[in-house]
């Protein structure tokens, strides 16, 4: 073997290694939320009907209403002149029903316009948040005042509005004004809605985990979810009709489906499945957690649609918090039930 001689120059050219770097979980940030939001917007735009066909349908509906009113008036005149009192009574009833129907259509149209105005306010708030720091906050102030008018004028809302106005300064830009508005005015409402969502999610989870009848579970949970969305809309001062409520449900459910809520529920169910419980108890508890998470997801999406100002960074409710609450509630409920059954059989 040939002998090798190392010189000082060769030693200096050795590779220098950098010290080891350690990263904590807090330093890792996932970029999934913007992608999910972008996907939801694309889906929502693709599912919107054509403006031409919508206007054509509304025009045909208005023409039908006018024709119905005109026909009922003509029927009233003809039966009155012919002294046909029985037919006249039917004509009066038909005229009243026609007026009620046209009034209901006008009321639904007005509430649909209100829902569209609400979404326009959300877009305006998004634009105000994207403005540069050197812009004036006067436009944001006027926007926030218009939002307060649509909220339910409770003593709490009036108190937090006064506190918000007392903290304003002429030097604040739009983003700072909206931040103060969210912290002072909308934050108490957000907390109430979050408690409402957590309560309904936990109750639905217990219903599914304890009840042995699947059909009854589905019907009861569906009814409770509809009531939950109605309570959320009232909390933010939204007045919805039948059609506008259906439209809101369609948007919420569409975003829920494409956001992969069922995948989240199954993952959490599998995590809980590994707990030291019996197989039967774990399956029922996992089903309850899955349904509770779907309820929480529905409530959070409805909250995002109903909130007049879009959520800023770190304001969006986290599904993981609801998950931990659900696991704790179900553990306590299922363990207490198992303990009662054991004591019952032991005493007998």
Swiss-Prot record:
One Pfam family of this protein, by short name? DUF697
| Range of residues in the leader sequence | none
Its main subcellular localisation, reduced to a broad class, is membrane
Subcellular localization: Cell inner membrane
One cellular component GO annotation, for this chain's record? plasma membrane
Q: Which InterPro entries match?
A: DUF697 (IPR021147), UPF0283 (IPR006507)
TM annotation in the entry: 57-77, 86-106, 203-223
Alphabetical keyword list: Cell inner membrane, Cell membrane, Membrane, Transmembrane, Transmembrane helix
- Membrane topology classification: Multi-pass membrane protein
Family statement: Belongs to the UPF0283 family.
Name listed for the protein in its UniProt record: UPF0283 membrane protein HAPS_0079
UniProt source species = Glaesserella parasuis serovar 5 (strain SH0165) (Haemophilus parasuis)
Q: What is the phylogenetic placement of the source species in the record?
A: Bacteria, Pseudomonadati, Pseudomonadota, Gammaproteobacteria, Pasteurellales
